[in-house]
From Swiss-Prot:
SMART domains assigned to the protein according to its UniProt record, in alphabetical order: REC
The encoding gene: cheB
Top-level taxonomy: Bacteria, Pseudomonadati, Pseudomonadota, Alphaproteobacteria, Hyphomicrobiales
Pfam families documented for this protein: CheB_methylest, Response_reg
Catalytic residues in the record: 162, 188, 284
Protein name: Protein-glutamate methylesterase/protein-glutamine glutaminase
Purpose of the protein: Involved in chemotaxis. Part of a chemotaxis signal transduction system that modulates chemotaxis in response to various stimuli. Catalyzes the demethylation of specific methylglutamate residues introduced into the chemoreceptors (methyl-accepting chemotaxis proteins or MCP) by CheR. Also mediates the irreversible deamidation of specific glutamine residues to glutamic acid.
The organism's place on the tree of life at top rank: Bacteria
């Protein structure tokens, strides 16, 4: 048995520190080795204890979590899991943290929540195991091809991601031109975060990016992000495809689920689709991507070296669902190659 993941808990609330510590300590594969109430205490604790993982509150006195995270990533890079309030302001700050290099995020529990921090221990263990080199600077993103260079065909694109997906999706979608193929995305994320993430992507990318709504038509130049929460994103509609938000139990522990999206794309579009599975814990999306490939779609997976967590892409690759494994920096361009109109017509 490998050594437990060693964690430093940083939060200005003694109650929250106690709750996080209790949740993590209930897992024998996690060891809380220290606590800190602000960034100054945390800095000294990191030097003294050398933790494998830090859980970091965003809103703290003396120095907020974002400023402290930047210092960690610059001076002593390590896996950091952000702990945030489930508000619009908290979502904006968390998304900024994920772009800076935080491993993942969890929301602070609301009143009466049945399982507070239910997946935190699993995220901590994944963070401790990650092979990602946190000291590596983010690769520069090439400008998207111009409209004149890209003629869109008839295919739709479906993308699934989880842990590490914020950075990965930005890297992929910033390669898309304004006239990109219709694209649907399921990213595992808390309900209040997806709207803020869609707005952030819309500011960063050439196409229009929006949170998916029930009945929204799939259109060229638009990207639809599954809203977090109570429903799954599917596509349907035959010759006039549209988004559908459906009430179903969680699949693979997730709602929305990547498998649900990929299954619907396989049924609707068959060979006129491209499926992409990016970094993430677990196996959600692997079976659905295999279904897409069996239906004739082209399928891509992110390489282990460029994943924050090589979980979902690994399972998909082992199942035979992935036609090509590519580094993150190459995926956006490959999607455009696979969805471009042929010279003699459109596909």
């Amino acid at each position: 048995m490998s050594a437990p993941a060693r964690v430093l808990v940083v939060d200005d609330s003694p109650t929250m520190r106690g709750l996080i510590t209790a949740v993590l300590s209930s897992d024998p594969e996690v060891s809380v080795i220290g606590q800190a109430g602000d960034a100054l205490e945390a800095r000294e604790a990191i030097k003294r204890l050398n933790p494998d993982v830090v859980t970091l509150d965003i809103e703290m006195p003396n120095m907020n979590g974002l400023d402290f995270l930047e210092k960690i990533m610059t001076l002593r890079p390590m896996p950091v899991i952000m702990v945030s309030t489930m508000t619009h302001r908290g979502a904006e700050a968390t998304l900024a943290a994920l772009e800076i290099g935080a491993f993942d995020c969890v929301g602070k529990p609301g009143p009466g929540e049945h399982r507070p921090f239910g997946d935190l221990a699993e995220k901590v263990k994944a963070a401790a195991r990650t092979q990602r080199q946190f000291s590596q600077p983010a690769a520069a993103v090439a400008p998207p091809p111009s409209v004149a260079d890209f003629r869109v065909g008839r295919k739709i694109v479906a993308i699934g991601s989880s842990t590490g997906g914020v950075e990965a999706l930005i890297a992929v979608l910033q390669k898309f031109p304004a006239n990109c193929p219709p694209t649907v995305i399921t990213q595992h994320m808390p309900p209040t975060f997806t709207k803020s993430f869609a707005e952030r992507l819309n500011r960063l990318c050439a196409p229009v990016v929006q949170e998916a709504t029930d009945g929204a038509r799939l259109e060229i130049g638009k990207i639809y992000l599954a809203p977090g929460g109570e429903r799954h994103l599917q596509v349907s509609g035959g010759s006039a495809p549209c988004c559908r938000l459906v009430d179903r139990a969680p699949v693979n522990g997730h709602r929305p689920s990547v498998d649900v999206l990929f299954d619907s794309v396989a049924e609707l579009a068959g060979r006129n689709a491209v499926g992409v599975i990016l970094t993430g814990m677990g196996r959600d999306g692997a079976a659905g991507l295999l279904k897409m490939r069996h239906a004739g779609a082209r399928t891509l997976g992110q390489t282990e070296k460029t994943c924050v967590v090589y979980g979902m892409p690994r399972v998909a690759h082992e199942l035979g669902a992935v036609e090509q494994q590519l580094p993150l920096t190459a995926i956006g361009e490959e999607i455009l190659k696979l969805t471009a109109a042929r010279k003699e017509g459109t596909e």
